[in-house]
Protein backbone atom coordinates (compact mmCIF):
# COMPACT_ATOMS: atom_id res chain seq x y z
CA UNK A 1 0.00 0.00 0.00
CA UNK A 2 1.17 3.58 -0.46
CA UNK A 3 3.25 4.95 2.42
CA UNK A 4 0.77 7.77 3.22
CA UNK A 5 -2.04 5.21 3.63
CA UNK A 6 0.14 3.06 5.89
CA UNK A 7 1.00 6.15 7.94
CA UNK A 8 -2.71 6.96 8.30
CA UNK A 9 -3.43 3.41 9.44
CA UNK A 10 -0.57 3.62 11.93
CA UNK A 11 -2.03 6.83 13.39
CA UNK A 12 -5.56 5.47 13.80
CA UNK A 13 -4.52 1.99 15.02
CA UNK A 14 -4.92 2.94 18.68
CA UNK A 15 -5.95 0.78 21.61
CA UNK A 16 -8.86 2.39 23.40
CA UNK A 17 -9.78 4.47 20.35
CA UNK A 18 -10.32 2.16 17.38
CA UNK A 19 -10.06 -1.17 19.22
CA UNK A 20 -9.79 -2.60 22.71
CA UNK A 21 -9.37 -5.98 24.32
CA UNK A 22 -11.67 -7.95 26.56
CA UNK A 23 -11.53 -11.48 27.94
CA UNK A 24 -12.41 -12.85 24.47
CA UNK A 25 -9.75 -10.89 22.57
CA UNK A 26 -9.85 -7.74 20.43
CA UNK A 27 -13.03 -5.70 20.00
CA UNK A 28 -13.50 -3.08 17.27
CA UNK A 29 -14.66 0.28 18.60
CA UNK A 30 -15.82 2.02 15.43
CA UNK A 31 -18.43 -0.29 13.87
CA UNK A 32 -20.57 2.67 12.76
CA UNK A 33 -18.03 3.83 10.17
CA UNK A 34 -18.16 3.21 6.41
CA UNK A 35 -15.07 2.56 4.32
CA UNK A 36 -14.61 2.68 0.58
CA UNK A 37 -11.44 1.06 -0.70
CA UNK A 38 -10.23 2.41 -4.03
CA UNK A 39 -7.47 0.32 -5.56
CA UNK A 40 -5.76 0.46 -8.94
CA UNK A 41 -3.35 -2.28 -9.89
CA UNK A 42 -1.78 -2.88 -13.26
CA UNK A 43 -2.07 -6.64 -13.09
CA UNK A 44 -5.08 -8.85 -12.45
CA UNK A 45 -5.16 -10.24 -8.92
CA UNK A 46 -8.81 -11.27 -8.76
CA UNK A 47 -8.26 -14.67 -10.37
CA UNK A 48 -8.01 -17.74 -8.13
CA UNK A 49 -4.35 -18.18 -9.10
CA UNK A 50 -3.35 -14.60 -8.24
CA UNK A 51 -5.70 -13.86 -5.32
CA UNK A 52 -3.21 -15.12 -2.68
CA UNK A 53 -0.73 -12.50 -3.93
CA UNK A 54 -3.14 -9.59 -3.48
CA UNK A 55 -1.85 -7.78 -0.42
CA UNK A 56 -3.38 -4.33 -0.42
CA UNK A 57 -7.18 -4.61 -0.45
CA UNK A 58 -7.10 -7.70 1.76
CA UNK A 59 -4.78 -5.95 4.23
CA UNK A 60 -6.89 -2.78 4.44
CA UNK A 61 -10.10 -4.82 4.75
CA UNK A 62 -8.56 -6.90 7.57
CA UNK A 63 -7.50 -3.77 9.48
CA UNK A 64 -10.95 -2.19 9.07
CA UNK A 65 -12.61 -5.41 10.29
CA UNK A 66 -10.26 -5.35 13.31
CA UNK A 67 -11.64 -1.87 14.09
CA UNK A 68 -15.17 -3.31 13.87
CA UNK A 69 -15.96 -1.81 10.48
CA UNK A 70 -17.97 -4.14 8.26
CA UNK A 71 -19.64 -1.61 5.92
CA UNK A 72 -16.94 -1.72 3.26
CA UNK A 73 -17.24 -1.14 -0.47
CA UNK A 74 -14.49 -1.64 -3.02
CA UNK A 75 -13.68 -0.20 -6.40
CA UNK A 76 -10.83 -2.09 -7.99
CA UNK A 77 -9.36 -1.06 -11.30
CA UNK A 78 -7.09 -3.86 -12.44
CA UNK A 79 -5.35 -5.07 -15.55
CA UNK A 80 -4.67 -1.75 -17.25
CA UNK A 81 -0.92 -2.47 -17.46
CA UNK A 82 -1.36 -6.15 -18.24
CA UNK A 83 -3.81 -5.39 -21.05
CA UNK A 84 -2.67 -2.06 -22.51
CA UNK A 85 -5.01 -2.43 -25.49
CA UNK A 86 -7.96 -2.28 -23.05
CA UNK A 87 -6.43 0.13 -20.54
CA UNK A 88 -8.58 3.13 -21.40
CA UNK A 89 -11.80 1.14 -21.09
CA UNK A 90 -10.68 -0.57 -17.86
CA UNK A 91 -9.91 2.81 -16.29
CA UNK A 92 -13.10 4.42 -17.61
CA UNK A 93 -15.23 1.58 -16.20
CA UNK A 94 -13.52 1.92 -12.82
CA UNK A 95 -14.05 5.66 -12.76
CA UNK A 96 -17.76 5.12 -13.46
CA UNK A 97 -17.88 2.84 -10.42
CA UNK A 98 -16.22 5.59 -8.35
CA UNK A 99 -18.78 8.13 -9.57
CA UNK A 100 -21.64 5.79 -8.68
CA UNK A 101 -20.40 5.37 -5.11
CA UNK A 102 -19.65 9.09 -4.78
CA UNK A 103 -23.15 10.02 -5.90
CA UNK A 104 -24.63 7.63 -3.34
CA UNK A 105 -22.48 9.17 -0.61
CA UNK A 106 -23.50 12.67 -1.64
CA UNK A 107 -27.13 11.71 -0.96
CA UNK A 108 -26.42 10.54 2.59
CA UNK A 109 -27.80 12.88 5.22
CA UNK A 110 -26.20 13.26 8.60
Q: PLM features: what roles do these ranges have?
A:
Residues 1-60:
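Helix-loop-strand module that forms the ligand-binding subsite of alpha/beta enzymes
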Residues 47-110:
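Glycine-rich phosphate/pyrophosphate-binding loop and the adjoining helix
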Amino acid sequence: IPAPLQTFIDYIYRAGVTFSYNENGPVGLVPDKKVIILNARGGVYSTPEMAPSEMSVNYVRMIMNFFGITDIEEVIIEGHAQYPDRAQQIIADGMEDVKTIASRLAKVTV
